[in-house]
Regions:
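Flexible, glycine/threonine- and acidic-rich loop/arm segments that mediate assembly and lattice contacts
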Residues: 1-239, 244-263, 269-323
Length: 323
C-alpha cells in the first residue's frame, strides 16, 4: 500500500484569502442518448405457444371456380374442395446484458450523496439499452429463416418481407409518392387476400424527400395524423386511406441522397399482422446474482422472444427509393 500527500491546489479551482473554490456539479446528468425505436413500441405483443411458437396460416378457402360451381339444377353434381392451411413457426431468441456495481464505488457514492440516483439510472439504462438492440434487430436481425434458424439473432422484418418477394425499386426519375401509392393500390386490389396496410415506416431522411416532392411538384403540404397520445406525424393519402408516415431511425440507408446512387427503403406494413412472441414476460427481466469474490453486484438483464411478419408475401411491401 502506498500513501500519497497531495497539494490542495491540485483540487481547488482557486485558493486565496477568504476563498477556496472547488469543483461542483449539477445534480442532473445531461442525457439525450437515443434509446427506443418506434417500431418496437408499436409491434403487437403476444405470448409464445412454446419453442418454437406455432400458428396456422390459411392461404385459401374452399371456393370452386365458376365452371365447377354452376351446374344443371336438374343434375346437381358438386365438386369436392377443401381449405388450404399451412403450419408456421417462430423460433424464440435470447437477448442478455449485464452491468456490475463495485461495492467500494457504491459506498463512496452513497456517502457523497450527490449522484445517489446513478445506480438506479444505470440499471434502467441497461434495460433500455437491451431494448434498443431489440428494436434495431426487429428490423435488421440477420437470421434468414423462421423454420431453420441460422444465427442467434431475430429473422428481422426486413428480411422476412424481402423473402416474401414484395420488393419494388424506384429509379432516380420516378416519383416517390406515386410509387408508394401504386404499391398500396396493388396490395388493396388483391383478389386473394383482404390486405389493409396501416402504416409506412421510413428513415426521416426519406420522409423529408417525400415532403419536399409534394411541395415542389404539387404545392401540397401533407396532412397530419395522431398515431398515439401526443405524437403526430405526416400522412399520405392512398387507396387504403391516410397512412401515417412514421419516422424510424433504425431503418438505415446507403449512399448520399442526391448522388444518384443512394438507396433509401421504406416499408408499407399491416401492423396488426406483425407479432412479437414473448416468453414469460414481454418486458426484459432483471436478475441480481450473488456477490462475486470482488464483492461486485452483478445485474443481468434477459429477454426471450421472436418476431414474425404474418403474410409477408402479400400484406407488406418494401419500396426502395434511389436518389
Amino acid at each position: 500500500m502506498k500513501a500519497l500527500f497531495l497539494d490542495l491546489h491540485a483540487a481547488a479551482d482557486f485558493l486565496g484569502p477568504g476563498a477556496v473554490e472547488i469543483n461542483r456539479y449539477q445534480t442532473e446528468i445531461f442525457d439525450i442518448v437515443r434509446r427506443r425505436g418506434v417500431f418496437g413500441q408499436r409491434v403487437k405483443q403476444v405470448p409464445a405457444t412454446g419453442h418454437p411458437s406455432r400458428f396456422f396460416e390459411q392461404t385459401a378457402i374452399n371456393s370452386p371456380t365458376a365452371a365447377n360451381a354452376f351446374v344443371d339444377p336438374r343434375n346437381i353434381v358438386p365438386v369436392v374442395g377443401s381449405p388450404t392451411r399451412v403450419e408456421r413457426s417462430v423460433p424464440l431468441k435470447a437477448l442478455v446484458s449485464e452491468i456490475n456495481y463495485n461495492l467500494f464505488d457504491i459506498e463512496v457514492g452513497a456517502q457523497q450523496s450527490q449522484f445517489a440516483f446513478l445506480q438506479a439510472k444505470d440499471l434502467t439504462d441497461s434495460v433500455e439499452g437491451l431494448l434498443r438492440t431489440h428494436d434495431v434487430a426487429l428490423w435488421n436481425g440477420n437470421d434468414t429463416s423462421l423454420s431453420t434458424p441460422t444465427t442467434a439473432q431475430y429473422f428481422g422484418a426486413i428480411g422476412q418481407i424481402e423473402a416474401g418477394g414484395n420488393t419494388v425499386t424506384l429509379g432516380t426519375s420516378d416519383s416517390i409518392v406515386d410509387g408508394i401509392k401504386s404499391v398500396v393500390a396493388q396490395m388493396v386490389a388483391s383478389s386473394s387476400y383482404e390486405v389493409r396496410p396501416t402504416a409506412i415506416y421510413a428513415n426521416p431522411v426519406l420522409l423529408d424527400l417525400i415532403d419536399r416532392e409534394m411541395k415542389t411538384e404539387f404545392n401540397v403540404v401533407l396532412s397530419t395524423v395522431q398515431i398515439t397520445g401526443g405524437l403526430t406525424v405526416k400522412a399520405l393519402s392512398t387507396q387504403a386511406g391516410d397512412l401515417p408516415l412514421i419516422p424510424e431511425w433504425a431503418l438505415g440507408y446507403t449512399g448520399t441522397p442526391g448522388s444518384g446512387s443512394a438507396v433509401l427503403p421504406c416499408y408499407v406494413v399491416s401492423e396488426d399482422l406483425i407479432e412479437y412472441h414473448w416468453l414469460t414476460d414481454p418486458n426484459p427481466r432483471v436478475f441480481q446474482l450473488g456477490l462475486t469474490g470482488s464483492l461486485a453486484h452483478q445485474m443481468v438483464v434477459v429477454k426471450f422472444g421472436g418476431v414474425v411478419v404474418k403474410g409477408a408475401s402479400y400484406a407488406h411491401y418494401e419500396v426502395k427509393v434511389t436518389r
